[in-house]
């Protein structure tokens, strides 16, 4: 993998992030804490991402549901996250209009 000058991160990480600018993402900093917001910009020096309309999220896992689920949110507006502190980034997909119609009807 080609390495970039910014902290030794592969350039493919930046390409993946840049392709998702404008989409809603969940950046997980540790197993129980992260931020959910709209990816607005990607920086290479320092390596990081800017999120807008951001919520700080607390996640919990149980024996019955081992994949952590968001259990609480708190408004945080805009935030910069250094990529060195992020464990995982998930791109969140929009809800299907069919599911939304069934839920509201």
Model-derived features: where do they sit?
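Conserved RNA-binding domains used in RNP assembly and mRNA/RNA metabolism
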Residues: 2-105
């Amino acid at each position: 993998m080609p390495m970039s000058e910014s902290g030794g991160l592969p350039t493919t990480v930046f390409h993946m992030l840049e392709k998702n600018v404008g989409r809603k993402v969940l950046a997980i900093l540790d197993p129980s804490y992260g931020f959910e917001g709209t990816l607005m910009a990607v920086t290479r020096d320092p390596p990081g991402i800017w999120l807008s309309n951001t919520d700080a999220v607390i996640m919990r896992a149980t024996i019955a549901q081992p994949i952590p689920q968001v259990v609480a949110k708190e408004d945080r507006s805009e935030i910069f996250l250094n990529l060195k502190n992020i464990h995982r980034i998930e791109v969140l997909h929009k809800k299907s209009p069919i599911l939304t119609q069934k839920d509201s009807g």
